[in-house]
Amino acid sequence: MAGDVYPHFRAAAVQAAPVFLDREATISRLADWVTKARDVGAELVVFGESFIPAFPLWNMLYAPVDQHAFYRRLFENAIEIPGPQVEQLGGIARRHGVVLSVGVTEKGSVSMGAMWNTNLIFGTDGRLLNRHRKLVPTWAEKLTWSNGDASHLRVEHTAVGRLGALICGENTNTLARFALLAQGEQVHIATYPPAWPTRRPGANIAYNLTDAIRIRSAAHAFEGKVFNIVSSCALDERTIDEVSQGNSDVQSILNSAPPSASMILGPQGEPLAEPKVGGEGIVVADVDIALSIEQKQFHDIVGYYNRFDIFRLILDQRPQSAMTVLGNAVEATEEVRERDRSSLKESIMTVTAQDREDPAKWPRKMAS
């Protein structure tokens, strides 16, 4: 058939539990899950929020004065980018020939304490394509993670189409979602934690993570006419034991919290496979990018179905850092030396003939 051919592939949303705050063991577990996903034909494999080394559930469950040990363990097992763990993850993607997306806690190379909630995307060749830091840590997460920037809030061209990603609550942020759609996003990745406890057991107004994931995921797929690959982490007994440390109150809160969910949705917001609610497993579905074309006829909010003469979104993708260096240090030093030489020359030229005989009248630089 004549004309363009668009990507058609199989996606896998992995819902798995990490080995709590054990970076190396969790990467090994990730490799096993990628093998399972590849065995069923997956070409895009997605893992949940801060899968490596774990999601900081303790932020919601303990007072800040009781969180220091958790914070240190998280930092010690976080990932520095670039670094050996990034090379490992790239190697896993390359060996299996998949596009790999994984949530990590990233630590800074300068500060012994700065961490970010980050999503990494690797190409089939193992190259790191994108490192997106969550723009704003949500609620209690502010006790752990720093703000990200928009330097990597972008869509990547991959073997499975134009790929964008947002982390957890960012999928509530209309402007962040539109920024990806406006860059031509075809496949969206949304990642979530294993649980989100906001109330003690029995509260009938507690935040329902399962419903929140379902509503946001369908909304973005429908509004943007994109496919949405949604992956959450799973909550296992080891994590509950490690976080609760024998505290029955904390155990009760975690056991009663609404579970996470993983799913794959089409451009009408429809599930393409049975969602996975709670527990571990893989959601697998076939994605045909061309199916978005018909839906775009009805509502194309980054095309004809908008008024850009009325609405305007500005995206600042400049990286943010602790310090901005203007110029090269060596060049700056030479500039100072040249300025001093010029100043000295001018001082010498101001010495009159009669002053030459009286050193007390010499300019200081000449006298020295």
What are these regions, as identified by a protein language model?
Residues 23, 35-124, 194-219, 223-226:
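Cys-nucleophile CN-hydrolase/nitrilase-fold catalytic domain and related Cys-dependent amidase chemistry
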Residues 138-154, 169-175:
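Active-site glycine-rich loop that binds ribose-phosphate moieties when present
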Residues 125, 130-132, 275:
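Short hydrophobic alpha-helix segments
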Residues 1-44:
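N-terminal active-site segment of His-dependent metallophosphoesterases
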Residues 79-101, 162, 168-283, 367:
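CN hydrolase (nitrilase-like) catalytic-core segments centered on the catalytic cysteine
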Residues 12, 120-122, 263, 283:
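Conserved hydrophobic/aromatic positions in well-ordered beta-strands
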Residues 8-20, 118, 131-133, 161-170, ...:
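Active-site-proximal beta-strand elements of phosphoester/diester hydrolases
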Residues 227-228, 232-368:
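C-terminal beta-strand edge segments of enzyme domains
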